[in-house]
Amino acid sequence: MRGVVVLVGILGCIYSISQFLRNSVGVIAPNLASELDLSASQIGFLASAFFFAFAGAQIPLGIALDRYGPRRCMLFCAAVAVAGALIFAAAPSPGWLIAARILMGLGSSCYLMAPLALYARQFSPDRFATLVGFQIGLGSLGTLLATAPFAFAVAVLGWRASFVIIAAAMVVATLAIVLIVPKDDGSEADRSAESLRDSFAGTRDAIRTPSFWPVFLLQLTGYSSFVLVVGLWGGPYLTHVYGYSLTERGNMLLVAVVAQVIGSFLWGPSDRLFNSYKIPVLAGSLLTAGLMALAAIVGAFSPTGLLLWFIALGGMTAYLTVLIAHGKSLFPPKLVGRGLTLFNMATMGGVFLTQAATGLIIDLFPQVDGGYSVDAYRTVFAVQAICILLGSLAYLRSRDPRKQL
């Protein structure tokens, strides 16, 4: 039991660094826009470059997980992520920042799927959703660090020095993987004998799995709703609409992340509680759509209403833990790595599309006193609500393996 706790702790720790990197633009977006004279669409593209690279890496990552094993993939990706963080810290121009975000996205691409592939092979299926909850819950600590603690570090050290510290933390976590995570077993060695053509055929088989597309389409909108706010537009929204300072917006984003951390642990076992994947997933997705619609209608909340909205957003979007478990349950063991990474491609691809598109949407509105009006953000929330509802409608067609147990 102690070994399991240490293993999950180490994997959750390095995943938290990945989470920090992906969400780090949210707090410093106004700083980057001011320092480098970036428009909303440029900020959106800068943030989304991470997710574009992350999503693009998922198919080859799925093949690599099944051929070479989780441990080797994590060690390789760590080197790429460290390089990206250091380049971001030293970047002299927007082009270098984007290149660094791409490297960070590639380097961070395996730190959810590799641990989940490891859990799928070493633990019983009925515990998988709970382990997903712990992995995402621990990883969410990185998102937490990307809010108020990061705002404090930026105020004291600057954002460049802060990224050097993150690179050093990634190096330490990588050493822990070397020492703690078990070496990949012989099953990967057997799979490595298959041809590249066979590997891609396995990806094709995963795509053809019944209920793949309904789950895939909801994955496009689930996580992107949370990252849209905490990882990108939450900071500018709080600054432009409410006049929040760096520290104040960091604190409010922190509230949402804490709510998601707690929510991840609570949502994790809900599939067993209801003996269903679909019931909790649909509840979470529809409540998230409702929150986005509420923000689109209200525009500017009262201070108490704003706080409650951020708490609810963090808690409701944590249903992703059950959606991941539902996706995993669709595949036979030999396709788990490829199947999970295909769903992760949808998750991160959805973030890329959402962040890039909303940057273009916000740029359609004229700036007001150096910022954007509440109507710009209301439009963003409305578009996201519609996307979630469409994803939920598609998800209704999925089969629920839990109902067959």
Label every PLM stretch briefly:
Residues 67-78, 272-286:
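Cytoplasmic membrane-interface "Motif A"-like loop-to-helix N-cap segments
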Residues 57-69, 263-276, 362:
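Helix-to-loop junctions at the C-terminal end of transmembrane segments
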Residues 94, 100-139:
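Cytoplasmic helix-loop-helix junction between adjacent transmembrane helices
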Residues 56-95:
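Conserved MFS/SLC helix-loop-helix module at the cytosolic interface between two early adjacent transmembrane helices
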